[in-house]
Amino acid sequence: MKEQKWINEGLITESLPNGMFRVRLDNEDLSLGYVSGKIRRSFIRVLPGDRVKIEVSRYDSTRGRIIYRLRNKDSKD
């Protein structure tokens, strides 16, 4: 049986080495996120200040995988 994951939204606050990011979730928790393979292959740029969807394990809520970058309202892309 596959492990169930929680999907949360958050704001990237800090960029760390090796494609890792510090993400402040909407419930005010801090999480360490890494970029998923599909985002990496598609050359999607993730920067501090971006809103993202992050997939967090039920067992370790301090780490997660960034699975989607949400569009900003003020950007043209």
Curated annotation (Swiss-Prot):
PROSITE patterns in the record: S1_IF1_TYPE
HAMAP family (alphabetical): IF_1
The keyword Cell membrane belongs to this UniProt entry's keyword annotation: no
InterPro entries: NA-bd_OB-fold (IPR012340), RNA-binding_domain_S1_IF1 (IPR006196), TIF_IF1 (IPR004368)
NCBIfam families, A to Z: infA
SUPFAM superfamilies per UniProt: Nucleic acid-binding proteins (SSF50249)
Cited CDD domains: S1_IF1
Disulfide bridges in this chain: none
Domain of life: Eukaryota
Compartment list: Plastid, Chloroplast
The protein, known as: Translation initiation factor IF-1, chloroplastic
GO molecular function: ribosome binding; rRNA binding; translation initiation factor activity
Assembly, per entry: Component of the 30S ribosomal translation pre-initiation complex which assembles on the 30S ribosome in the order IF-2 and IF-3, IF-1 and N-formylmethionyl-tRNA(fMet); mRNA recruitment can occur at any time during PIC assembly.
The entry's keywords: Chloroplast, Initiation factor, Plastid, Protein biosynthesis, RNA-binding, rRNA-binding
GO cellular component terms listed in the entry, alphabetical order: chloroplast; cytosol
Organism: Cornus mas
Function text: One of the essential components for the initiation of protein synthesis. Stabilizes the binding of IF-2 and IF-3 on the 30S subunit to which N-formylmethionyl-tRNA(fMet) subsequently binds. Helps modulate mRNA selection, yielding the 30S pre-initiation complex (PIC). Upon addition of the 50S ribosomal subunit IF-1, IF-2 and IF-3 are released leaving the mature 70S translation initiation complex.
Family recorded in the similarity comment: Belongs to the IF-1 family.
Domain S1-like: 1-71
